[in-house]
């Protein structure tokens, strides 16, 4: 069924003035969009006309509504969070105001509540007339923001990114400030292929009446179209895999070339508080135009914003840095601290509610216990002076980490030129505490040779072989990434050690918490350390000389945890769409609903009728 997924594109075109009242008109065009980042609208698109001066026209609202998918639960509220209303008139006025500014490299210039990088003014193109917006097309509805393509009368195209209202206003503002500064750093300092930013707004107090990033439009196909991770071994497969892995590995290598003076995230000089403005982000800058351009401020890594809507910003600010480069312990502990504060805040709200669900209280109480364990073990996880870890000092130096390095975020502008996009949540941290890009990362059992590592592989049934094939392909792809890392940064290859992966697992699992029961994976990764603790102490891998494991587990507790973890894994595997949080692509949702597989409940949610699934099995083409 996934083969039927298509993204919908809407286009808002500015037409000539009408003869009645001189009002600007627009056409709202809905068309199917697949694969390309710059496909033309379909000729069969539906068109709805609206007056640009009529900001309350209900037909216009469709242009801002979320249409990419639906959720099994709380669908209306989740779609409401993803509405991206902005002022079309304000956008036109704002762009023309930018055109009147002088092009100059300096700190972002304040303009009508937003900020302009005037050194990138050339993105507007040139015209003797007033710069106006000719058309606006919705080209992508992502996980965290919506993307519109803006076409100007100069012939130039821009991208307008509007973030969803998934986090607090303060979190959205911090993430936008840091992402724009990170993009600017990658472009000006490292000379990397990233879209230049023209302007950004961190709240709704600007002419667009929405937070936004306005940046360069890059045409081309996504590198993901070339990514086929489960193909059998062959020279052609090896070549194809390297066509995707190599440019991303090279991009990472250039990012790793700079070591910073603190842990945190990048911002422009004027976007951090005064006490942080005196500290340069890195040593040795010889370009006077860059020496005071960026600073390191609080981390915008996702654990400080994800599911933290109930937590006061003042509490978050106590734990999100920045941290001195010598204080890795504080960085490690911050994850446990913020999750502890979040869980305790939720528990307080439950205790104050007489009608609260008792199961929720039990769940959060267990979360608190796990995060207390994480806080206890975090300072001891990895010895930053260990003689057993090759180049340990290099591994702990502050370096820029981009969490979404992925072929989905790489545009092939030409056959030999790739552009990288999406730098939300980028942070500066020790390389040893980062994880591999998700498209190559594999945490399952490793199989390096099917016939040698899997007894009786040749005699197995085809279905059983496929399970081992999958494990082998995932191992192969991760191994290819590690070989590229070793090729470019042999001094950092110690991160490939299985022991290092085990030691940092509690920290990484905590960073990846998405829902309430994910704490079980954090606890499981802590428990896993217990069996090897004495050996890790003896080899000075951990930051402790005590061979006694720092956390005392009873046999009863371990049995209960193992059972709960197994139940959760079974629940995840057996529950339809659990991996996507109950989200279903819209065309698939409509099909399943029409077939009676999805049935609406009294409270407006949807449930899956398993009997109907058996009556409507996917066709062979859909299974592929």
From Swiss-Prot:
GO CC terms, sorted: mitochondrion
PANTHER family given in the database record: ALTERED INHERITANCE OF MITOCHONDRIA PROTEIN 9, MITOCHONDRIAL (PTHR36091:SF1)
Keyword entries, A-Z: Mitochondrion, Transit peptide
Protein name (record): Altered inheritance of mitochondria protein 9, mitochondrial
Pfam families per UniProt: APH
Organism for this UniProt entry: Candida dubliniensis (strain CD36 / ATCC MYA-646 / CBS 7987 / NCPF 3949 / NRRL Y-17841) (Yeast)
Cellular localization per UniProt: Mitochondrion
Stretch forming the transit peptide: 1-34
Main location: mitochondrion
Protein family: Belongs to the AIM9 family.
Keyword Transferase included in the entry's annotation: no
Record carries keyword Transmembrane: no
């Amino acid at each position: 069924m996934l083969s039927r997924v298509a993204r919908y594109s809407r286009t808002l075109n500015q037409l000539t003035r009408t003869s009645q009242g001189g009002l600007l008109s627009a056409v709202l065009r809905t068309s199917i969009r697949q694969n390309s980042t710059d496909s033309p609208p379909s000729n069969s698109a539906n068109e709805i006309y609206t007056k640009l001066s009529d900001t309350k026209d209900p037909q216009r609202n469709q242009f801002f509504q979320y249409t990419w998918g639906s959720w099994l639960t709380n669908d209306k509220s989740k779609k409401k969070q993803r509405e991206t209303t902005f002022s079309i008139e304000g956008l036109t006025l704002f762009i023309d105001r930018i055109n009147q500014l002088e092009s100059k490299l300096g700190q972002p210039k304040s303009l009508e509540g937003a900020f302009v990088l005037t050194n990138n003014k050339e993105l507007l193109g040139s015209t003797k007339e007033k710069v106006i917006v000719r058309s606006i097309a919705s080209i992508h509805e992502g996980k965290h923001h919506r993307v519109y393509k803006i076409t100007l009368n100069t012939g130039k195209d821009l991208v307008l990114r509007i973030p969803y209202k998934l986090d607090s206003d303060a979190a959205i503002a911090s993430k936008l400030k840091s992402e724009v500064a990170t993009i600017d750093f990658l472009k000006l300092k490292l000379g990397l292929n990233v879209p230049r930013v023209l302007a950004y707004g961190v709240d709704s107090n600007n002419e667009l009446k929405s937070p936004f990033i306005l940046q360069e439009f890059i045409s081309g196909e996504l590198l993901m179209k070339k990514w086929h991770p489960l193909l059998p071994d062959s020279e052609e497969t090896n070549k194809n895999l390297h066509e995707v892995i190599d440019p991303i590995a090279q991009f990472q290598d250039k990012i790793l070339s700079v070591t910073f003076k603190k842990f945190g995230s990048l911002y422009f000089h004027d976007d951090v508080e005064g006490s942080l403005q005196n500290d340069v982000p890195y040593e040795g800058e010889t370009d006077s135009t860059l020496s005071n351009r960026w600073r390191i401020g609080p981390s915008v890594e996702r654990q400080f914003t994800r599911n933290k809507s109930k937590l006061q910003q003042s509490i978050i600010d106590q734990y999100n840095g920045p941290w001195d480069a010598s204080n890795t312990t504080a960085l490690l502990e911050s994850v446990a601290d913020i999750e502890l504060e979040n869980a305790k805040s939720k528990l307080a709200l439950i205790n104050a509610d007489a009608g609260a669900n008792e199961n929720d209280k039990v769940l959060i109480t267990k979360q608190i216990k796990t995060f207390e364990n994480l806080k206890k073990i975090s300072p001891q996880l990895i010895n930053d002076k260990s003689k057993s870890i090759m180049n340990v000092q290099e591994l702990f130096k502050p370096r820029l980490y981009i969490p979404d390095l992925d072929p989905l975020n790489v545009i092939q502008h030409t056959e030999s030129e790739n552009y990288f996009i999406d730098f939300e949540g980028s942070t500066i941290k020790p390389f040893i505490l980062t994880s591999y890009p998700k498209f190559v990362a594999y945490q399952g059992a490793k199989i390096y040779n099917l016939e040698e590592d899997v007894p009786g592989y040749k005699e197995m049934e085809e279905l059983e072989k496929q399970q081992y094939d999958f494990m082998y392909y995932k191992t192969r792809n991760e191994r290819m990434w590690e070989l590229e890392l070793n090729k470019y940064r042999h001094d950092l290859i110690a991160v490939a050690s299985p022991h290092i992966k085990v030691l940092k697992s509690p920290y990484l699992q905590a960073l990846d918490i998405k829902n309430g029961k994910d704490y079980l994976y954090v606890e499981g990764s802590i428990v896993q350390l217990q069996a090897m603790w004495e050996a890790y102490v003896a080899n000075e891998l951990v930051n402790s000389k005590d061979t006694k494991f720092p956390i005392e587990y009873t046999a009863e507790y371990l049995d209960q945890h193992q059972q709960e973890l197994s139940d959760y894994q079974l629940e995840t595997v057996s529950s339809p769409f659990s991996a996507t949080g109950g989200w279903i692509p819209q065309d698939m949702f409509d099909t399943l609903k029409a077939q009676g597989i999805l049935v609406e409940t009294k409270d407006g949610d949807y449930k899956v009728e398993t009997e109907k699934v058996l009556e409507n099995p996917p066709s062979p083409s859909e299974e592929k």
